[in-house]
């Protein structure tokens, strides 16, 4: 019955793979390394906060397992900090989390006079600051939940501003088009923003650069046309960073293609050679 509750306990013993904690009643609690935020660091005698993830009952010897990486821990911290959630005026609809890095949380208000995002963040961030500190500076985006999936995807990709979306609801996939300067915001550092948006909305999100109105479409060639010469997974890796045309690749910095699309230098050089040859003919 303690599963899902937040516990503060004293660090009693530190091992390589887990930490042993003792609560006020002398109960032994385990915080495995896999349930710790990557930057967590504790010393003996310090207090740690975590949520009860499960109780392992082996040989009639129950072990209480704690977690700091669970979305439930983030949810409970918001419930403690935001009275409107505790009172049932605001509900947390969805959480997506990459522990210690970034999280997105979708909230909804049952009282139209209450702004759910503002209530969760607090005046000058007063409510969210404590949660961010507890989670080792995990960046938390709070967004308004909506059952309109297209609008939800748009909000989930913030701070990027979306130009248009083509939905493929049968495949749970969305093609998102953005202005060139918004693409890197949508993807986020290390791809975190788009990954969390996908987790939150449960949709595969493909990001594309919107071709400007002055771009002459027939002068450029979509990457899909090169499937005979370039492996499909390579094309998909490039499209995932918002570039879907040959000129888009040729105009992009080589380092960006290597780093953002996570491709080998040789692979990028081969692609550039193939695409250049197309325009030199």
Which positions does each model-derived feature cover?
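RNA-contacting regions in translation and RNA-metabolism proteins
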Residues: 1-281
